[in-house]
Amino acid sequence: HWTVFLNKNKEIFDEVVICTGPWSKDFLHKLGYKIPLAWERGYHHHFSIKKDIDLSPAIHDVDGGFVYSCNKNEIRVTSGVELNFRKADLNEEQINEVVQKLKIILPLKNKLTKTPWLGSRPTIADSLPMIGKAPKHKNLWFNFGHNHIGLSTSAGSGVVLADMMENKKTSINIDPFLPDRFML
């Protein structure tokens, strides 16, 4: 059995899934695992724009290295990602460069964010999520490491993991995703 502490309550479970995104490495380190996980950190800023500008809902400027999306009289601009530690200081160099490029083509008004928003996405060394049984602990399962596409891929891997937990045939070949592909 596993005892999980949630706020001031504790719950006991037969099985537990570690699906804690960028915090998975920290959780599993306490259990003796050395997960080859890094963090893709991406930044974005919000700006107001003039009301009379008609823009596409989203543009990906490959050469400029940014994406912007519009919502009413606001625009959000995102930069590429950096590989860094989850708790590393903000590195605004990339997003600031992107903002300068965007100012050349769009009349940005007020910056609506004081500092850029920062998201840390868990990235396994081989770029594949880790899905399956924990190699050292009974009834412990992994489902994390979905890189910057976790919002769209983690639910599908959850279905696959549920099948694994129930000893059902999975809809995909799970071998490339198994945790034991690494010496943890």
Where are these regions (language model features)?
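Generic recognition of long tandem-repeat/solenoid scaffolds
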Residues: 3-5, 77, 143
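Short linear sequence motifs
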Residues: 6, 36-37, 170, 175
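C-terminal lid/capping helical subdomain adjacent to the catalytic/cofactor pocket in oxidative enzymes
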Residues: 134-184
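Active-site substrate-recognition segment that forms the wall
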Residues: 10-138
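Short, flexible active-site loop motifs that bind/organize anionic cofactors or intermediates
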Residues: 6, 85, 148
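Conserved beta-strand-loop-beta-strand element in the redox core of flavoprotein oxidoreductases
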Residues: 1-11
